[in-house]
Amino acid sequence: MGDQFDSLMERIRVRQAEMSGEGEVAKENGPVTSKITSVKQEVASPTKVFGSSSKCNDGPSTPVHFHPQEPKETTPNMKENAENSLNSFKDATVNESSSKKTSRFSMLAQEIDEYEYDYQSQYNKPKEAYMKGRSPRMSIGETRPAVLCTPAGAQAMKSPNVAVSSKSAPEIALGMSDFEARRIKFAQPIVNVNYLPNESSIFSGGSGSSVNDQSTVLGGSAEMMNVTTSSLSCGELSMNQHITHENTIINAQSCDNREAILRERQQVSNEEYGPHTFMRKKVPKEASSATSSSSSTTTLTTISGASGSTTSGISNAPQDSASTKTTTNTFTSSYLLTKTSNNNINALVSSSPKPFSKDIGRSMFSPVHFTPKSTSSPKTLSESIFSPSKSAAVEGSIATTRRLQFEEKLKKSSSANVTAPPAPTSAPVPTPRHVAPLAPTVAQQSHLTPNHRHAAQQKKHLFPVVGIVATAPIPVQTQWRGQSNTPVVQGARADEKTAGNEPPVGAGVGKLKNLKSRWEFSSATGTPIHPDATEDSLIATAIKMKESAIPKQLGHRSERKGPSASSLYSQGARSNTASPASKSTRYEQEEEDDVFEAPEFNDGGDVISEDGILQEEEEDTSKFIDNAFGFMEGSGAGTPSPYREPPLQRLEKNRPPAEVIEEETENEDESEPYEPEEEEDDDATTQFPVPERSRKSSSQLAYSVSFYRKIQRDRNEESSTVLAGPVISQISPSAPPMSSSLTSQQKLRQLTTGPANGARIVESAKDAHDRIKRAIQVEEQLVAQSKRAMILARDKPSFRGSREEFEAQWAMLRHVEKHRALLTEYDRLKRDGPRIIDGPRGTITVSQLSVNMARDYVSANIASSKKSDEVFYFAAILRYGEQVDVSKMVTSDGGLNRRGVLEFPVPLMLTGIPPDFRATVEIYGQRSMRESTSHEDKYKLKNSTFKAKTRNTFLGGGSTSSANQSLFVDPAASSSSTSSTTSNFNLLGTFSFDINCPGKHLYNMSHTVYPLEGITQMKVRKQAIDGADITYHGFLSMYQRTGEGLGSWTRYWCALENGEMKFWKQPEDEGTKGYTALMDLSTCCRSEGASVVEDICPFPNSFHIDVWAPKMDTSDPRGIERLRVMLAADTAQDLQTWLSLINSTSKQLCTWRNPIVNQ
């Protein structure tokens, strides 16, 4: 350090002498050597030195002439070089003139502009500097003066001059190092600059530095810029490398002791501190560049200005690195600078390394890299090293093992240039029958090597697209849309493509987008996979989706902690997200049985399927992916192939046929005279019970424990409830305890035919008796009240023939008719028992009831000049069974004002009636004279005078009391004593209607009486208050379209309840999760509901249901369109069961619906 300060002071003295003209005086008075010697003996303070210029570390752009102090220990070469430098210095000093004072200032100003001082304050550090902790110098409490008291933040340590060691320190002759240097990464990469070759040479070799400590000149940041400290190759002339102490020790040891060395070096303090970074602006590279510096090492060269040749400063003695143990400081040398040209200076500066990139820093970041040889620039990428546990987890995954096996097979087949036949396995994966076999070409197989990451452009060779046979186009649009009371299915929209619009492409056959679509419709997670994802990420995501989609088995413990590669075939075939067969505890012993039939192999090794299609396992990449990911046969997620029979069904075929007779017990009430008759099968020849074990094994589908518990819970609820007749409960076509009884033909006949056995009794006979008795008592009281009001109105002359008297007669008519209907129903109940309702009950509402009046009566009133003195009162009655509803009373004046149409504005209603009802509408009326007494006279109000008025008799004779008599009453009956206690309303016409009537229709009345005409019009609104009484549970496959317009069959758990078909992914989801799809059977286009598909759908056991749905067109908000829903059962027997139940339910629901006509 002292020698450097002396050199700097001498340089400053020379500059001051040149500016003040002292140079010429010194030349005249004495030799230059004595002046330089006297200048060397003067001591300058550090404050003055660094106060003069903050950039005294860097060399100027123009030659600077000064002579440093000669070292005490020099070599002969050094002495000779010193003499040459003194001679050149004398010549330059004589030629200098004081006239260049102004130009010298401009040169100094230019130097300041060309250099840049980047000072990073400790309070303005980036975020990354704090993520790894504070600076070591601040955190460990550094107190050494050499570190804390260094002027300008270790500025002298960054000087291009070489630090000279003490006298006692011996020189170290080091050989060429072949190890890779430690990587230093800056927190903030500095761009648009070229780093000086020696700007990072701030390491102190006395105590050494920790290898793991990554503090830098930016204040302790852990992520730094990579700077190599490796040595040059043998062919290089200059060795501008600074070998640090720790690298020397690491190079001396063997590779086995590297970790131990790193742990020992962590305890050593670090002196690589300094908050400043000096850099030079970019200088264009020149052809005269002689060296290429690449590391933060100390320059050790001697530049000759006369000849421009570069020679080595010291001699390098060869030394064995394996036995060398260096514990001393770095080597020493003298630095002699002479007059050189700008090109020679730029040759050292412009060869700095390029700025470090962020990507390289991430891949190369490591405390120490152990490589045999390293270049001068750390630009070589290296693969990231995983930990042993992570590597074992990645290499041991199921999908990775399957991928490696598949690539190995492809490699073998490509080397032989012949596709080898597949070896028979215990449980091979079946291929869909409508898909052609897939065979990759040799060119495609050449890209596939084991343990090779496929690039994006190579994935298209691994998954080629293969077309399949197109299905016939569907006549009607097949889609699902969501609105109220319309079918709803997730994953489909109205604007999606149909199967017949474009040429179909294989769904899920070697295309990532199709594979993504299968996951969207089939997996339980619903997480989409990007089609451009790499193969490894694709497999990893598929494994996660498979684990989350398949619940754990209840009561089952796996003996193996992880799946092996040998069990992938059977494991992939059993992984079914829709069917819970793998979750049943009853099938633990049958876990190894595959749900598909094992294909046969011929002598040539080809796989022979049931329909004769050849398959080759290693050639079908889509089949391999489906197997590895846990899919079942191509486009279906968990849909078993309908072309193969389940193993349980094959066992059932081998068993001798036996017919099971179900004994049904029914709770019958003693008061019921008629009992439902059970139909017996005349074709039954052998009748014997089947054991419980065989009954369980006859089921074709497995269920989970939760499903069995649900059935048991439903049984307990049914046993605790006392019913008056047979009630259809929740049934399942394949549940083992109930399979034989629910799929028998006898039960189907009970569900679909015969109102006696398949009917529903709403209430018992006792309850019906009690209810009707109470209703009769109420109506008797109301009849008595109406009778008293009518007698009171007739006894008083002021109310005789008034509106109040006719209101009392209307009330009397209403309650008398209700009482009469209740008595009739009570007699029927005692005779026939409670009413049996076949199907859901409903409600009808009759509105806009209008009756045409006789034309001659309307014409006479219109032609008359004054209003007629007679008036007619009318009332309408709607009746069915014990229910009677009476309309408000209207007069003939309202009909005359409406062109002869008599309207009843208040609607009539019947509630809770069976679908086989037949209701009757009756019109009652009577004739009377207009009221002549005013309101004040009737109620004897003040300021009113009672005036008796004579009236014309109604029948041409009699007193005024006869004015309230009806036109239609018999004179003999009117003269009897009971005429004052009965209503004078008489029947003028009647007509009937049933559930098949349209919404608004004209009816012809029978027994019509003047002044009514026999034409009536009304609007009937029918609405079911009960859903369908059929409840059924089972599996159904649903046809859906993907985003590309392709078809996909997905298996769902379906529950038919209350006329609605609800779909879930699994049986356990029912009652705990919301349904995936809903279809209301009341929207069926036909009352038959479902029909079998035989010509347009290749899926076996399929059927379709046509429904009405509102149009999505905003211009026609009330428009409807016809949609078709495609479904499929598992077996032919299940198909017949579903068709019978759906058609019966649809028929029951459509009976309460008005006929829909598509406009």
From Swiss-Prot:
Pfam family, one: PH
Keywords attached to this entry: Cell cycle, Cell division, Cytoplasm, Cytoskeleton, Developmental protein, Meiosis, Mitosis
Keyword Cytoplasm among record annotations: yes
UniProt xrefs under SMART domains: PH
PROSITE patterns found in the cross-reference section: PH_DOMAIN (PS50003)
GO molecular function, one term: actin filament binding
UniProt keyword annotation of Iron present: no
Compositionally biased residues, Polar residues: 50-60, 564-584
Bias kind Acidic residues: ranges: 660-684
A GO cellular component annotation in the UniProt record: midbody
Recorded phenotype for the gene knockout or disruption: RNAi-mediated knockdown of the protein causes 100% embryonic lethality. Abnormal polar body extrusion with large and unstable polar bodies that often fuse with the oocyte. Failure of contractile ring to transform from a disk to a tube during meiosis. Ventral enclosure defects and failure of neuroblasts to complete cytokinesis. Aberrant microtubule-directed cortical myosin polarization.
Disordered: annotated segments: 43-81, 266-327, 409-430, 549-608, 629-699
InterPro entries registered for this protein in UniProt: AHD, Cytokinesis/Rho-signaling, PH-like_dom_sf, PH_Anillin, PH_domain
Tissue: Strongly expressed in dividing neuroblasts under the ventral epidermal cells during ventral enclosure.
Name of the protein this chain belongs to: Anillin-like protein 1
Originating organism: Caenorhabditis elegans
Recorded name of the encoding gene: ani-1
